[in-house]
Curated annotation (Swiss-Prot):
Cellular component GO terms, alphabetical: extracellular space
UniProt protein name: Allatostatin-A
Keywords, ordered alphabetically: Amidation, Cleavage on pair of basic residues, Neuropeptide, Secreted, Signal
Role this protein plays: May act as a neurotransmitter or neuromodulator.
Region listing for Disordered, in residue ranges: 131-151
Family: Belongs to the allatostatin family.
InterPro entries (UniProt xref): Allatostatin
Upper classification of the organism: Eukaryota, Metazoa, Ecdysozoa, Arthropoda, Hexapoda
Positions of modified residues (Leucine amide): 64, 88, 99, 148
Residue span(s) of the pro-peptide: 22-54, 103-135
Species in which this protein is naturally found: Drosophila melanogaster
GO biological process terms on file: negative regulation of juvenile hormone biosynthetic process; neuropeptide signaling pathway
Gene: AstA
């Protein structure tokens, strides 16, 4: 019984494969016209002599490998399109306008507390004048350091 099922399954698979590969009824059946067109176009390119370089480059540039970036500039020779590195390597940060190493915003400057002991001649009036700012140079880096040096 199992061998009968195996033979029927094999027959069914063959029938499905035949039906799937057969052309659709009512569709125009071309008897190799597309192959003839390709060969005719290739013969025309061979007749033109050296003018077929541009067509050949366009024909074989499918987007694979080096030929994906080739194009002609209208004259003799070929140029290569620029290859853009999208964030790979050392300059992976998209917008670094020279802010340098001190451009990290991982802290809140308003909540910064200076834990150093104030000097003995520290005036309370100075604190009343500038309550938010404890010291000109803080212990953490400033968010915008444009390389002006120390002041």
């Amino acid at each position: 019984m199992n061998s009968l099922h195996a033979h029927l399954l094999l027959l069914a698979v063959c029938c499905v494969g035949y039906i799937a590969s057969s052309p659709v009824i009512g569709q125009d059946q071309r008897s190799g016209d597309s192959d003839a067109d390709v060969l005719l176009a290739a013969d025309e390119m061979a007749d033109n002599g050296g003018d077929n370089i541009d067509k050949r480059v366009e024909r074989y540039a499918f987007g694979l490998g080096r030929r994906a970036y080739m194009y002609t500039n209208g004259g003799p020779g070929m140029k290569r399109l620029p290859v853009y590195n999208f964030g790979l390597g050392k300059r992976s940060r998209p917008y670094s306008f020279g802010l340098g190493k001190r451009s990290d915003y991982d802290y809140d400057q308003d909540n910064e507390i200076d834990y150093r002991v104030p000097p003995a001649n520290y005036l309370a009036a100075e604190r009343a004048v500038r309550p938010g700012r404890q010291n000109k140079r803080t212990t953490r880096p400033q968010p915008f350091n444009f390389g002006l040096g120390r002041r």
